[in-house]
Regions:
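N-terminal export/targeting and maturation segments
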Residues: 22-100
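Extracytoplasmic electrostatic interaction patches
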Residues: 92-173
Length: 173
């Protein structure tokens, strides 16, 4: 009788441990994703983000790209962060943003601040909101411009823009 219980208990224990491990792995990837450094916008061209980012980024002194893939149960999302730090060209970069987007090409026209950067969501018609969305952040103190791009084919709504940026870009800003 005891042997049959032991034969039954061990497989159940193994199954439970495997299920907990898989669940932990899925929760980790959902919250963290896989962050990779990207050397140029061409490496992320397949994601359709090239129209959002400035095409003259090679002209700036300090440009960094970071891509974050987050895997959910049956779908994935990608976020790309472009950080441009060039104090000498900072004012002209801001002017380029106004030239490209004006004052009205932003969702709700409501900027929000996160980590001393002022962000706005872009309503550029080429982005298929909410599945694709871009944010532009400006840090006056760092003389830095951030371009944040997000894609998730399964996303139906975003909610609060600040919470969205914190959830999806906190590790790359």
């Amino acid at each position: 009788m005891r042997k049959s219980r032991k034969k039954f208990f061990i497989p159940i224990l193994v199954i439970v441990l495997l299920a907990v491990s898989v669940y932990g792995f899925l929760v980790y990837w959902d919250n963290h994703g896989m962050i990779t450094k990207v050397d140029s916008i061409e490496e992320v061209a397949e994601y359709g983000a090239t129209d959002f980012f400035p095409t003259d980024y090679q002209d700036y002194n300090n440009v960094h790209f970071v891509k974050n893939n987050r895997f959910h149960l049956i779908f994935e999302s990608e976020s790309i962060t472009m950080k441009i730090t060039d104090p000498e060209k900072f004012e002209s970069m801001k002017a380029d943003i106004v030239d490209k987007y004006g004052e009205n090409d932003f969702f709700g026209n409501e900027p929000f601040e996160y980590k001393s950067k002022v962000f706005r969501a872009v309503t550029d018609g080429k982005l298929g909101y909410p599945k694709q969305i871009g944010f532009i952040g400006i840090s006056e103190s760092e003389k830095t411009i951030y371009y944040l791009w997000f894609y998730d084919f399964d996303l139906d709504s975003i909610g609060d823009m600040e919470d969205f940026v914190i959830k999806n870009f906190n590790q790359t800003i």
